[in-house]
Structure formats: structure tokens, C-alpha cells
Amino acid sequence: MVIFEKTRGKNSPSVMPSKKGDVSNIPANMLRSKKPILPEQAELDVVRHYTQLSRKNFCIDTNFYPLGSCTMKYNPRAAHKYASLAGFLERHPYASAQSVQGTLECLYDLQNLIKELTGMTGVSLAPMAGAQGEFAGVAMIKAYHHKRGDFERDEIIVPDAAHGTNPATAKVCGLKVIEIPTKKDGDIDIEALDKVLGPKTAGIMLTNPSTVGVFERNIAVIAKKVHEAGGLLYYDGANLNAIMGKARPGDMGFDVLHMNLHKTFATPHGGGGPGAGPVAVNDKLKEFLPVPMVGKKADKFVWLEEKDVPNTIGRLSAFNGNIGVLIRAYIYGAMLGGNGLTEASKIATLNANYMMARLKQEGFTIAYPERRASHEFIVTLKPEFQNYGVTATDFAKCLIDRGVHAPTMYFPLLVPECLLIEPTETENVDSMEKFIQAMVEIRDIAKKDPQYLKGAPYNLPARRLDDVKAAKELDIVWQPK
């Protein structure tokens, strides 16, 4: 029940009278024609309502959250604590650079940390989400070709195992998407790549490790072929958590990338924001980076604006990015340091391989059994579907009943009835074993009573929602009747 429905028409809480202001200068079409619909609740009732809702939330602070490709790692409280210091929290966006030197120094150091981590030479922290960073990266590729007069380069190559945002970003930037297949071993089909490379190629968008959870072994060959064709390589940083300190996109031949700080650098995840998706580039694309950036002149830190970067693709938003998120990322990086970030990647990889081996041991089917998991892996429940009629969705709903968030379902699309599982480095063996035992228990139930799975979840206030109705009849301005 939403708060509007609880006591409407029953209670009329008193409010302090307010003096009516002059509204004569407000256009008539901007004035309300009727009173707003507001919940009628006392303060205590409101507190109880939202406290009860919070207890129904599922989050990384309450339970294991192995959502593949999302890197649901713990957000350290120290980062929140120090990012909430008055000097950071109370800084006004219009404050002069001279008055916020401490904040700018943190951002400057974060830019340098990202350069070192990725093997790139230029960084902008301006994008306010991973998707916006992705847009900025492809926009820079387009700007690069246009400056060279290569206006015919309007094709972006995207593997079929790519993130769904990749083709969407290319489309938003006015480019055509050319899809190529992934082979049965998880690597890109090089022969298919050769067939689509040509004078219209603007670039290729890759995630490495890929969304099927394996490292692209032919990345050096791919980079050479794309560059020889005149294209550029875009690195989707969604899976960067798997390789920190072990491999760098710049060294693989990538020209531009975006990072998801809510994944790699453990900033708050989900809830609609705020987010941060920094972009990093090599020398080819530095002149196109979005502004503002933080620079250093003499011993002072400064904002670099359009006048300092004349070929920039421009601003992506008002002000200077989501600095509260960026500060949290800086603190996370400072706490771990280079060795700590490398260790985090090692443990993330170890955890993924442990879970993959254990589930294989328990008789589940691994999508790419001959490959090592980089940080996540895929279980296909196709045998369970064929033998018992239960689906990946049924397993997912039953997992929620057992206090474990479901892994990513049906993604990537090329693996049938799949669960994409990513434990991250912040989980211990007990948490992972709880998940494994839950999977075994659910399969045992499926053998005896598959209809039980069809009715799950049983322990939540909402059970199976009508996904089609929600998509077809979207209501984002709901009001009580």
C-alpha cells in the first residue's frame, strides 16, 4: 500500500498557516486548477510507513547480491563519512576554484589514479553516469573522424555479447550498429570481424573481460585489425573490476573508455543516482574530452573549461559532475592504493571461480566450462527447463525467498535460460556457499514439485508481477483515485 492510500479522507492533519504570496506574475496556465493530492498522515505515521518499507528493501547491506555484470560490491562507510565532511558537502557549485583547492586536489589525484589504472593519458570526470560516459566516449570517436574529414565512417561494430547500452549509445550518436557473433569458446569471431571492417568503420565497442565472463584472448589481433581499417576501439568499463592492476585497456590497444565508479570504485549503486562515469582516452582523443576537467597551473588547481579545450565535445551537464560520488571514489582508491586495488581484483576473480567450480561440482551446467571465469560466469538452466519445465525466472524467484538476490537473468541473450553470477571481492565463503546450497535445494524441489517453483516467491508482499502489462501500460504519474 502506498502512503496516499492509507488514510485519505480519514485524517486531516493541521498545518501551520502560511501567508499567501503574490502570484499575479505567474502565467495562468502555470497555476493549479485544483488542490494537490497529498497524503494525510501524522509525522509518526509517516516515519512508521517508510521504516516498514525500508525493511522490505533488498540491498547489498542486507544480503548477498550476485547480480552479474553489475559488480554489487560493498560501499565502505569510511568513504561516506569523509565525503560528508563540511568542506566537501557544503561546497557551492559556484564557489571559486581558489576557495575549493582541497576538493580540486582530490579530483586531480583521482584523474591521475584513473590514468594509471587504465593506461590512458587523459581523463574527464564530468559524465554523471556510466551511460553518459559511454555517450561521451562514442561522441569523441565521432568528433575524431569528423575533424579528419572522415564523414563516411558511421558504423560501430558491436559483439552480440555486448551490453545493451552499447548499441543504444551508438544509435544516440547517429551511428549504425553492425553486430558480430561470439564463438562457442566465448571469444569474438575474427572472420566475422574481417567481413565488416572497412572504410565506413568508426570503431568497435568491447567489454574485456566480456559479458560472458571470459577474457578476450584475441584482443591484440582485434586492435590491430580495427586500427588498420582506420577505426578506434572503445572499452566499456563495466568489467574493469576483474583486471585492476593486472591488465590495462590502454595497453590492449583501446583508445577510449568509460568507468562505472559504482562498480569499480564501490560508490553507491542503484536507486536512480547520483552516479559518475569518468572517461579516459589516449593522445588521439585528448582534445575532445568533455569539460570541465581539473588542471594544475603553477601550484594551483583550476577548472579547465571550453576556452582551455577548444575541440571539446562540450559540457554534459550543469556544474562540475557529481562531486560527492567522485570524492567517495577518490577515498576508496586512496584507502586501497594500487596494491589493494590489485588484490581486490584477484579476490573477485577467485570468488567467481570458486562459485563456478562448486556449482559445476553440484551438477549445474556452466556455459563456458573450459574457460576460467574472469569475475563472473554463466550457469545455463536449459537442462532443468528441458527435464522439469522450470525456468531461470523460477529459480530466481525461489532464490529471493531464501534471502539471496537473484543473479542477472537471460543476459547475455546468446545463452538460453541463463543466470549471470558475479560475487565480487567483498563476499566470504559462507555467503557463497549459502547461494550454492540454495541452488541445489531449488533444483531438488524442481524434480519433485516443479509447480512449487512456479508460485515463488512466497515470502514477499508482491509475488509475480505482470511484466508485459508493466511495459505496455507504463504509469509514471500514478495518482490515487
UniProtKB/Swiss-Prot annotation:
Region (Disordered): 1-23
Cofactor(s) needed by this chain: pyridoxal 5'-phosphate
Entry EC number(s): 1.4.4.2
Top-level taxon: Bacteria
Gene Ontology BP annotations: glycine decarboxylation via glycine cleavage system
Keyword set includes Cytoplasm: no
Single GO cellular component term: glycine cleavage complex
Catalytic activity line of the entry: N(6)-[(R)-lipoyl]-L-lysyl-[glycine-cleavage complex H protein] + glycine + H(+) = N(6)-[(R)-S(8)-aminomethyldihydrolipoyl]-L-lysyl-[glycine-cleavage complex H protein] + CO2
Positions of post-translational N6-(pyridoxal phosphate)lysine modification: 263
Gene3D superfamilies reported for this sequence: 6.20.440.10, Aspartate Aminotransferase, domain 1, Type I PLP-dependent aspartate aminotransferase-like (Major domain)
Keywords: Oxidoreductase, Pyridoxal phosphate
Molecular function terms, GO-annotated: glycine binding; glycine dehydrogenase (decarboxylating) activity; pyridoxal phosphate binding
Function text: The glycine cleavage system catalyzes the degradation of glycine. The P protein binds the alpha-amino group of glycine through its pyridoxal phosphate cofactor; CO(2) is released and the remaining methylamine moiety is then transferred to the lipoamide cofactor of the H protein.
Family listed: Belongs to the GcvP family. C-terminal subunit subfamily.
Self-association and partners: The glycine cleavage system is composed of four proteins: P, T, L and H. In this organism, the P 'protein' is a heterodimer of two subunits.
Protein name in the entry: Probable glycine dehydrogenase (decarboxylating) subunit 2
Organism of origin: Francisella philomiragia subsp. philomiragia (strain ATCC 25017 / CCUG 19701 / FSC 153 / O#319-036)
Taxonomic classification: Bacteria, Pseudomonadati, Pseudomonadota, Gammaproteobacteria, Thiotrichales
